[in-house]
Amino acid sequence: MGGLTVLAVVVVAYTLVASKLDRWWITGPMVFVAAGAILGPGGLDVLPLSLTNETVVTITELTLALLLFSDASTVRLQDVEGDAGLPRRLLFAGLPLTILAGALLAYLIFPGVGWAAAALIAAILAPTDAALGLAVVTNKAVPVRIRRALNVESGLNDGIATPLVTLFIAAAAAEESIGDKAWGLEALKQIGLAIVAAVVVGYIGGKLLAFARERGWTSGVSEQIAILALALLAYEGAVAIGGNGFIAGFAGGILFGAATRGRLEEPVQFTETLGLSASFLVWSLFGALFVGELLTHDLSVRPIVYAVLSLTVIRMVPVALVLIGTHLRPATVAFMGWFGPRGLASVVFTLLALQEIEHSGGGMLLQTVTWTILLSVVLHGISAPPLAARYGASIAKAGNIPEKAPAGEPRVRLHDLAGRHSLRGQQARETTSTATGESAAGTRPS
């Protein structure tokens, strides 16, 4: 039986028991990372793939491109502006501080690493992925303002980090004397051409689709296909002219949302669904190739130390700093700081980096990112349900506090649901646990 056949069986088996696993805080990413590790080179070796395999790179890149476009087109800039400022603080102050702190510690922890490679590690691990801790943004016990801020942050920070990752990859390659010495100009060229592709595909394409829809020329199916095609065209078009496809996908999604004024959110879900399906495969590839690399090499302590710091100090201290003046409770600051899971964007960024820096820095980068994501998949996955319930219960007892300020309900993106079986099932369990008092206690069900 081939590796892909076995993987398909795993997918079917997971769908049959997903709700049961959900009750035990076992998430989709956990299942598929474990399956990949077992089936990959470090295990049964029935998935004959490598990190440089063209199929692997294509699948992961297109998955991120689809999710960047769909996220950016639905989590619009208006969402950032509509709150009291929490998403803006996290995105435009917290993200740069996180990268700065991560770069500094990487430079200190890894001997011989240059400033560009240190900054690259930090930028790769800066974006968050709400799918790994879905209970945090769906549990109604958590104040809507907090859920909304974390949801918007997760939806936009991978796209915002992409230009920095592009810049640092070019700088790190030049630092190792394997890249273009004019790395800054090359990176700026990629960013500029990506914006051109985004305008042409995202904005003009969105205007044309909205124009056709208003005149009744489209159908629901044709709109879904058109949006998928635009997402792929933004990515591939940018790559074809020498631009960065991910920047084009993200910027194209923003411009598409602006051009259509949010009136095509429902058809966008088709693109999200494809991204969700592909994300299961990406998590399996992460387990097979990234985790597989760890299983076949000697244990190194420094990457583990950095991984722990990345999930704690490097994330939590900047979040605490940018939330000064918001009058949020210390428990809220700690809650928001802890729930910054690292996921799919970091996987794809690492593959991109490894294509350019395959020398001394590549192994250290791979181990560091792998340990960080692996720990995040497990720790954020198992801690999200109980901590969300306990935090929500503690806030519910408080009076009129800033956490309870009015805010719009966050839109839960479909690919976030990869972390849990279904929102409907979760809500049903929340209702039951509230009635029995389990929600406040965070008791693990038997």
Predicted regions and their residues:
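Transmembrane helical cores of multi-pass secondary ion antiporters/exchangers
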Residues: 1-445
